[in-house]
Curated annotation (Swiss-Prot):
Gene Ontology cellular component list: clathrin-coated pit; clathrin-coated vesicle; Golgi apparatus; mitochondrion; plasma membrane
UniProt KW keywords: Coated pit, Cytoplasmic vesicle, Endocytosis, Golgi apparatus, Membrane
PANTHER family for the chain: CLATHRIN ASSEMBLY PROTEIN, OS05G0549000 PROTEIN
Segments forming domain ENTH: 24-161
Residue segments, region Disordered: 325-346, 474-571
Compositional bias of kind Polar residues: 523-532, 543-571
Record CDD domains: ANTH_N
UniProt-recorded name of the protein: Putative clathrin assembly protein At2g01600
Pfam families attached to this UniProt entry: ANTH (PF07651)
């Protein structure tokens, strides 16, 4: 086993030296590539500071953005090509150190690069070289998830919790507070879940198995522990600020705040267990672990009671909304005042007091406007009575009366206002139930004669005139059938048309001109029957010239030209 491990170390050292020689010859960024290869070699020890300083200088704000992008690309290529857990872990340590101690522009460039491709995606990474490598590979995957969540938290918060300088609330106070203490309710509900998710990934970096005693993993775990203190401090200050604003929130915000408060209590217990596990490691000598206290559970009951009575909506903001109603300023007082007919239809403001002993007054007779109104419920006119015949006869006498068209005829309003717009399709669905009913009052001629009645009189006269018999001519038989093709049967089509209609072309014409024996047979000439179904089922017979019978088969006649089942001679 020891010989195999020694061989693997020698093979790794050979690969590192070969890689360094290649990048010095082929790379444009030779110094940067050499520093990355030496900082992430196969030796199980933390990256050296001299190599890290070269990488920090290549990603500083004074360098071009192309140099920073090349450094990120080189680290990503180194991370995804290796299958050794030591190289992968040391590459993640370099990235973590750059996030903590590097230039702020590096975080922005790394965030932009991660949006195009997940640089820290190591969910399928596994080193099968030894059983110890299995446990170390599992911790490498967990560590990569923490760094990825740290980058996502930076995207939400727009600042780094580790690089943040905690200001002091009072001049004489030693301990400062984070930015979450001064956030408003909306920002607080957005940033606290991101911080809690980062703390969840941090607690998951607890080493297990053979990874507990590896000094490279403990070096990376020390970086994680340093960040846990400020992350917990930011969450704790945010919870205090959340409690102060809780009773001013709406119901949906209060429910979200309650979930954050419950999760904060659970994570406090999990973080305490994580600290207890780290106290047994060698790195515990360099840390002073804080004492964590869970949020009081009594306040949790108060929050649940408030949610039951919390308002469902928030107050309407003072600023105008996007869709607001504004009255039309272009309307004048004449347009807004009702007309005389509308005043009659509006209810009066006078209140008549009627005693219980007096009988109610009879209803007033319907007005002329109400009589002209058309009931839209009776669209078919089933409830409308037949018009009086005497009235129609009196109106027919004035059908041809001349009426002056100088003055425009009054149009019925049907209880509509003066500014009624008939072009609206919504109003047309209601006010125009049928074309016949709505236009009945508009078809009035002089004297009140209806145009439909006048048209029906003319139609009746035209029908009676057409039914009168003409003397001297026989009446046509309505049951006689006429052949539409009778006029074209007696005329032979042109030769071009015959060639088109003949499917066998010139062959059949040549065959027909050959003399063939015919048999004597007295056949009846075809009669011209107008019935198109008279000869149904018979074969068509073409008249041919009678030739003498020389075959000796008697008088049995066979017409080879007209047999549709005869042989064409093609076989």
């Amino acid at each position: 086993m020891g010989t195999l491990q020694s061989w693997r170390k020698a093979y790794g050292a050979l690969k590192d030296s070969t890689k360094v020689g290649l990048v010095r010859v082929n790379s444009e960024y030779a110094d940067l590539d050499v520093a990355i290869v030496k900082a992430t070699n196969h030796v199980e020890c933390p990256p050296k500071d001299r190599h890290l300083r070269k990488i920090f200088a290549a990603t500083s704000v004074t360098r071009a953005r192309a140099d920073v992008a090349y450094c990120i690309h080189a680290l990503s290529r180194r991370l995804h090509k290796t299958r050794n857990w030591t190289v992968a872990l040391k590459t993640l340590i370099v990235i973590h150190r750059l996030l903590r101690e590097g230039d702020p522009t590096f975080r922005e460039e790394l965030l932009n690069f991660s949006q195009r491709g997940r640089i820290l995606q190591l969910s399928n990474f596994k080193d099968d070289s030894s059983p110890i490598a299995w446990d170390c590979s599992a911790w490498v995957r967990t560590y990569a998830l923490f760094l990825e969540e740290r980058l996502e938290c930076f995207r939400v918060l727009k600042y780094d919790t580790e690089a943040e300088r905690l200001p002091k609330s009072n001049p004489g106070q030693d301990k400062g507070y984070s930015r979450t203490r001064d956030l408003d309710g909306e920002e607080l509900l957005e940033q606290l879940p991101a911080l809690q998710q980062l703390l969840y990934r941090l607690i998951g970096c607890r080493p297990e198995g053979a990874a507990n005693h590896n000094h490279v993993i403990q070096y990376a775990l020390a970086l994680v522990l340093k960040e846990s203190f400020k992350v917990y401090c930011a969450i704790n200050d945010g919870i205090i600020n959340l409690i102060d604003k809780f009773f001013e929130m709406a119901k949906h915000e209060a429910i979200t705040s309650l979930e954050i408060y419950k999760r904060a209590g659970q994570q406090a217990r999990s973080l305490s267990d994580f600290y207890e596990a780290c106290k047994g490691l060698e790195l515990a000598r360099n840390f002073q672990f804080p004492v964590l206290r869970e949020p009081p559970q009594s306040f949790l009951t108060t929050m649940e009671e408030y949610i039951k009575e919390a308002p469902r909506v928030v107050d309407v903001p003072a600023e105008p909304l996007l869709l607001t109603y504004r009255p039309d300023d272009g309307l004048t007082t004449e347009d807004t005042e009702p007309s005389h007919e509308e005043r009659e239809m509006l209810p009066s403001d006078d209140v008549v007091v009627v005693s219980e002993e007096t009988e109610p007054s009879p209803p007033p007779p319907p007005s002329a406007n109400a009589q002209n109104f058309i009931d839209t419920d009776d669209l078919w006119g089933l409830n409308t009575g037949a018009p009086d015949t005497s009235v129609i006869e009196d109106q027919n006498a004035l059908a041809l009366a001349i009426v002056s068209t100088d003055a425009d005829p009054p149009t019925p309003h049907f209880g509509q206002p003066n500014n009624y717009d008939p072009t609206g399709w919504e109003l047309a669905l209601v006010t125009a139930p049928s074309s016949d009913i709505s236009a009945s009052t508009e078809r009035k001629l002089a004297g009140g004669l209806d145009t439909l009645t006048l048209s029906s009189l003319y139609d009746d006269g035209a029908y009676i005139a057409s039914q009168r018999p003409v003397y001297g001519a026989p009446a046509p038989n309505p049951f006689a059938s006429h052949d539409p093709f009778a006029s074209s049967n007696g005329t032979a089509p042109p030769p071009q048309q015959q060639a088109v209609n003949n499917p066998f072309g010139a062959y059949q014409q040549t065959y027909q001109h050959q003399p063939q024996p015919t048999y004597q047979h007295q056949s009846n000439p075809p009669t011209n029957n107008s019935n198109p179904f008279g000869d149904f089922g018979e074969f068509p017979v073409n008249p041919v010239s009678q030739q003498p019978n020389t075959s000796g088969y008697g008088d049995f006649s066979v017409n080879q030209h007209n047999n549709p089942f005869r042989s064409t001679g093609l076989i």
